[in-house]
Amino acid sequence: MAATDFIVAIELGSTKITGIAGKKLPDGSIQILATTSEISSDCIRKGVIYNLDKTTQSLTSIIKKLESTLKASIGKVYVGIAGQSLRTIRNTEVRHLEEETKVSQELIDTLMDSNRMAPIVGYQILGVVPQEYKVGLDLTIDPVGVQTDHIEGRFLNIIARNSVKQNIVQCFEQATIGIAEDSEDLIAPLVLAEAILTPSEKRSGCVLVDFGADTTTILIYRNNILRHLAVIPLGGNNITKDICSQQIEEEDAEALKIKFGKAYVEPTEEYDENKIFSLDNKCSIQAQLLEDIVEARTNEILDNIANQIILSGYENNLMAGAILTGGASNMNKLEEAFSKRTKIQKIRFAKETQYVIKGSELPKDGSYNTLMALLAAGKENCCLAIPEVITPEPIKEIGRKDIEGQLFTMDGESVEEIRKQEELQRQRAKEAALAAEKAAKEAAEIERKRKIECEELLKEAEGFKEDKKFKEALKRLSKAREMQIPEKEGAISTLEKEIKKLKEENSIGNKFAAIFNKILEED
């Protein structure tokens, strides 16, 4: 029986691209309907697409396999942004008000919009996490309703290189696969954090570390707010490649790492120079050499994690400790090594998400956590809705039932031809649905750019106001009003009143100055 209500998620990993289809059940659990994957080491590096054509081919193959299992067409999917270059930077936006004013949500939105327009060459802002607001001399998370003449908005911007998102969108377009509307700026590490961290951990302060194949992602939370995010371009594959340098095939190197590798070797542990690690007589390596290789590279990764924790400024505020996840977190003795290098004693391993899973069993080693988190974040039905086509009843055969030949309807039409037409209609309906979705996204992008342009005009007007160039300021406001953006009307009107008031005061001041100068001249 074909599935008609399901969510599809795709994870773009450095070793494989994985697709999953599932259904959210009334009891809150998730039923897995289908999973499949394709090797991605030849098209994705450090979590970022570098070969668009090969990625497109893999995506097309994954969708076909999922559709075959589901016996239904997939209209859109959920996909997250991750990989190298993804990180956070801080920014502060300041507003000096002419008089004591009650802070409104509109003013907060204006600060947020200004922050989003902060120029970052070569990068784009994917998400914004407000940290706090300084109202007068006080710091608060929710300033709406407070009286003040000065406000600062402190924001944490999540950024990535422009090409990261562009390449994802381009590959999905080439594969004629729609991306769910609420998945446009889905940041995979944040979704993972929601699926793994408890409210208590996020409140008390913790560091979440996702050990991947090519990258290691670090997130720091405190008081339920993301405080820092960074991606280190090192992962489990780096250890494997170091072992490969000993003239060992990559597949065997990976097996040696998993079977014999240790992230931490006790200083008191005696070395046996003659001890050898081998795999069914296929390959072998001196035990001490393997341990040295694995420990050295692991320490490099852990030292980078420790450095990011220090850079965040929250190294002394992680009461809930560290939560480790990801496929590469299964390294033997990782807990001891992590504690030694980061000085964090409280460590928890998250081998699976908090969601109850039904249906197919997934590996409980942390490698599917991000994929499950993306699936759980999905809200829209990903099944492609295709208009139902009524198939005419074929003519009943008269006489021998074993007569072979073409079937025709009562109207004399070929049943085979009708089936072909139905398939063509389905394909056209799918293309029309994708085209409509693309048009909607383009319209939304145009509207977003209009809002940015309007905000720029407001900022220019604010600048001219400060310079007492009131005529120029009012011209900018007039242009902004002509754009007819409802949510900006309030800000335009408020600023217009301020400028007109200042212009009038300035005019009166000039008149008094002229009279005073005339009196002085007469004297």
Residue ranges and their predicted role:
Residues 312-315, 333-348, 381:
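ATP-binding/phosphotransfer module of carbohydrate and carboxylate kinases, centering on a glycine-rich
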Residues 72-83, 312-327:
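Short glycine-rich phosphate-binding loop at a beta-alpha junction
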Residues 9-10, 19, 79, 172, ...:
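Residue-level signature of catalytic and energy-coupling elements of molecular machines
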Residues 10-16, 81-82, 201, 208-215, ...:
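A short acidic Gly-Thr/Ser loop motif
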